[in-house]
């Protein structure tokens, strides 16, 4: 079942993906890496080529693809753009499974992307083995990608306050 695989994505990525194409690369029967693209980029020209290149570089045996989109999950058949993205991925690497997920959180639902009829509930991401491992390692799990971006954004007021202290410290003040 894909429920536990989808449920582990926030722990591996650091945030729950939305409007995303996620590729879970497998090597020797284990997850070797997880890659994510904004769905808009993945469905655009050459979008999945980035994923294929990275997956091939890691010499993965196969990949599980997850399209995370409430809109796509409502469609019984993937849109042409999403199908093209999945086809592009499968043209470059062996796709062992593809699912469409409405949301990666408790209560979310997944179904196979090829109409096979398989579907199920997303396992609670907060209680996954991967989430426990992430917390044990001291990694923070963010509520969204925007929270991750905000955590590394430059604080203009703080930079302005520290800049005078950096004069003569050996580095460009503008990079504070």
Functional labels for PLM-detected ranges:
Residues 26-30:
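Short acidic-glycine loop/turn motifs at beta-strand connectors
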Residues 3, 7-12, 18, 37-176:
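Charged, compositionally biased boundary regions
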Residues 31-35:
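Short small-residue beta-strand/loop micro-motif enriched in glycine and branched aliphatics
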Residues 21-25:
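Short beta-strand scaffold segments in enzyme catalytic cores
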